[in-house]
UniProtKB/Swiss-Prot annotation:
An example Gene Ontology molecular-function term: structural constituent of ribosome
InterPro entries: Ribosomal_uL13, Ribosomal_uL13_bac-type, Ribosomal_uL13_sf
Organism name: Syntrophomonas wolfei subsp. wolfei (strain DSM 2245B / Goettingen)
Entry similarity comment: Belongs to the universal ribosomal protein uL13 family.
SUPFAM superfamilies per record: Ribosomal protein L13 (SSF52161)
GO cellular component terms, A-Z: cytosolic large ribosomal subunit
NCBIfam families: rplM_bact (TIGR01066)
Subunit (UniProt): Part of the 50S ribosomal subunit.
Function: This protein is one of the early assembly proteins of the 50S ribosomal subunit, although it is not seen to bind rRNA by itself. It is important during the early stages of 50S assembly.
Gene3D superfamilies: Ribosomal protein L13
Name of the protein described by the UniProt record: Large ribosomal subunit protein uL13
Pfam families from the UniProt entry: Ribosomal_L13
Keywords tagged on the record: Ribonucleoprotein, Ribosomal protein
One GO process term, biological-process aspect: negative regulation of translation
């Protein structure tokens, strides 16, 4: 019996909606990263993008445990000398709550070409509305 290797053309992609209301950032992000990679499928192949599309709604209602709202910092670089920008997560969740989930999920994906193609399948929205009704996404409840 030969080992099965998925080919990009034969991957059937589904759309899932995940509600982030009152979910912990890290636990939600690890579950989303697993779906984006395709680890929930029996055809999972590490070097092929076998994952599904994920829509995360209510990103503004995400929770952080402990005092991470004040202590944890979100950093990004503008590309210019001295361009390191830093803000705490309380400010980030007020200004751009989608960015908190995107950054957490991106850190859990492969840091290469494959990971960059996987992150494009993640759609995050701060409210409960999203423009992807035509794809007929199914609601997915998280474990735990």
């Amino acid at each position: 019996m030969k080992t099965y290797v998925a080919k990009p053309a034969e991957v059937d992609r589904k759309w899932y909606v995940i509600d982030a209301s009152d979910k912990t950032l890290g636990r939600l992000s690890s579950e989303v990263a697993s779906i984006l990679r395709g680890k929930h499928k029996p055809i999972f192949t590490p070097h092929v993008d076998t994952g599904d599309f994920v829509i995360v709604i209510n990103a503004a209602k995400i929770k952080l445990t402990g005092d991470k709202l004040n202590q944890k910092k979100f950093r990004h670089h503008t590309g210019y000398p001295g361009g390191l920008r830093e803000m705490d997560y309380r400010t980030l969740l007020q200004k751009r709550p989608e960015k908190a989930i995107e950054a957490a999920v991106q850190g859990m994906l492969p840091h290469n070409r494959l990971g960059r193609s996987m992150i494009k399948k993640l759609k995050v929205y701060s409210g409960s509305e999203h423009p992807h009704q035509a794809q007929k996404p199914e609601l997915r409840e998280l474990k735990g």
